[in-house]
């Protein structure tokens, strides 16, 4: 019997979702992206060759896998065509296997201009977006003025809609933000030129998904970013503009709630965050000055914690079970995939946050707002480290006993099994204890 599996990041993103999607998508007929845009970066390492994907589903490296970009994704045609060219330059067949929903909101230069103008105006209080126009594009979608991929199929109507939207956003850019306007004719010409290259990929993605379900075929839904960046459930306002939880797979692709059979929650063995926002277990280290917490330096250096999309330094800290348990509930996680265990290999001891001290009380339920997270002080348990390499370990029993104990403690606190264990960046450096499609 087939399964529909959702892969979700349970922290602030960068948990290692891309590698796991690539790993288990060999069992799937189709891989579906359902939210976000090219602000996400999924890094795959296969036979020591690194591929970074931003829009195209991570199943693209398997020749038999169909890759679907559903209507919950905001689409930059420029970013998509660049990614296609890079993959096809590496002899990977993309255009015959990639399909795009007509409902995908399109990202244009005025979205990027607005994104950057807002961040500049906010100054030190800026959220720290990727500057790719994601937020303004979702705003246009909700305001019902956005242009979608399906509009490209009617160039005359597209041009008319675009003119109206450009006038609106140019008013904002010039009169509120005091920045230069964008050129309608330049945007129109570029968009229609790009449309010629992607129009043949635009199909009813939702119907395609339901055909696979009717045919009893495995489907993998690939989440981007992480639960704590969810527009509704994350550390608002330091969040992204889409629903990054498993519920987003339903609304962002058009399947029903009961169509989902298994949710794999990706958990990094420590915690990272890019950009601004509260981070209770952060071990502050600044790579540019080489000053700060020694453990934070180890996590960032050994873990190569720099954003795949922006190149920015990721902030690092201990594993936070307070936020994770909330994430597991929000996503109805079935099993855990624990990644980057090997980054902890050199540490004498490891810590897990099991509660917060907030307003003089010890709490195990996370606060609802960013200020509460900022005020929260972590309460840790400390466990012995293993000081032995776990990279490429080929069985659970061959792990150091201290590493096994760390994993078992996570399972105990989460009340969930660790079904997959990643012990290195390469596809082969993974222990599958229970396959999500079985």
Swiss-Prot record:
Could you read off the lineage of the organism from its UniProt record? Answer: Bacteria, Pseudomonadati, Pseudomonadota, Gammaproteobacteria, Candidatus Pseudothioglobaceae
For GTP, which residues are the binding ones? 13-19, 41-43, 314, 340-342, 422-424
Q: Which GO terms describe its biological process?
A: 'de novo' AMP biosynthetic process; IMP metabolic process
Q: Where is the active site?
A: 14, 42
Localization of this protein: Cytoplasm
Catalysed transformations (reactions): IMP + L-aspartate + GTP = N(6)-(1,2-dicarboxyethyl)-AMP + GDP + phosphate + 2 H(+)
Which positions in this protein are listed as binding substrate? Answer: 308-314
EC number per UniProt: 6.3.4.4
> Which PROSITE patterns does UniProt cross-reference here?
ADENYLOSUCCIN_SYN_1, ADENYLOSUCCIN_SYN_2
Self-association state and partner proteins as the record states: Homodimer.
Main location, first listed in the record: cytoplasm
Q: Mind listing the GO molecular function terms for this protein?
A: adenylosuccinate synthase activity; GTP binding; magnesium ion binding
Enzyme class name: ligase
Q: What is this protein called?
A: Adenylosuccinate synthetase
**Pathway of action:** Purine metabolism; AMP biosynthesis via de novo pathway; AMP from IMP: step 1/2
- Which UniProt keywords are given for this protein, alphabetically ordered? Cytoplasm, GTP-binding, Ligase, Magnesium, Metal-binding, Nucleotide-binding, Purine biosynthesis
Q: Does the keyword Magnesium apply?
A: yes
Whichever gene encodes this chain, its name is purA
User: What role does it play?
Assistant: Plays an important role in the de novo pathway of purine nucleotide biosynthesis. Catalyzes the first committed step in the biosynthesis of AMP from IMP.
InterPro entries in alphabetical order: Adenylosuccin_syn_GTP-bd (IPR018220), Adenylosuccin_syn_Lys_AS (IPR033128), Adenylosuccinate_synth_dom1 (IPR042109), Adenylosuccinate_synth_dom2 (IPR042110), Adenylosuccinate_synth_dom3 (IPR042111), Adenylosuccinate_synthetase (IPR001114), P-loop_NTPase (IPR027417)
Family named by the database record:
Belongs to the adenylosuccinate synthetase family.
